[in-house]
Amino acid sequence: FSNSRKAEQNQVWVGMAKETAHQLGTPLSSLVAWLEFLRLKGMSSDYTNEIEKDINRLQTITERFSKIGSAPSLTKVNIHEVLKHSVEYIKTRSSDKVIFDLKVPATEVWAPLNVPLFEWVIENILKNAIDAMSGNGKIDVNITNQHQFVYIDICDTGKGIPKSSYKTIFKPGFTTKSRGWGLGLSLSKRIIEEYHDGQIFVKNSEMNKGTTFRIVLKK
């Protein structure tokens, strides 16, 4: 029963992901056309370049959704650069009251990743951290390089997670927010564990003090 139920859930996941990608496709095409129109009308390149960045980001998200359910290709990349890119992206779109601190080892750390999917995970955890801190606090991102494994710890100074919810938060539909589907952490778990053969879990959390998520990857 459990295997058939899991297969059924997988089909639902894949169906939702591909439908989301399909639904995003048409408005994205329109946005690209409108951007060209604004350029022809002489809008400042400062504005159009920022709009283009976000359109490209939407296209990346669409690509991510369309790939759910198929085996992603992994390429050995510098994790420092991937994390830096994700942190910078979220930083420019969050309050000045959120402090980001990325700590990396002196030597580069490389691991096989599907970069778009992995960035999805990091950005999702960072956004959750910002929500948990109500847009005011500090987020530390630390990389530890040990033998055949890489450990990535993302720590916030937010409201914390009760121990009884450490595993529940990774289940589809779980959310403490009034908005959204509560799919972010569940998707993150699938991406790390099923596609990257890694682990993601709550390392520790204290109520009203903060939470640390840990990602473990093989090198």
Predicted segments with their positions:
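Short alpha-helical Gxxx[C/S/T] motif in the catalytic ATP-binding
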Residues: 17, 184, 188
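Short conserved segment of the HATPase_c
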Residues: 161-173
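Detector for a conserved hydrophobic position within an alpha-helical segment of the HATPase_c
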Residues: 192-193
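Acidic ATP/Mg2+-coordinating residue in the GHKL
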Residues: 156
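Glycine-rich ATP-binding loops of the HATPase_c
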Residues: 196-204
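Short beta-strand/loop element within the Bergerat-fold HATPase_c
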Residues: 136-148
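A conserved beta-strand-to-alpha-helix junction within the catalytic ATP-binding
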Residues: 75-87
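Conserved catalytic submotifs in the C-terminal HATPase_c
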Residues: 99-109, 146-147
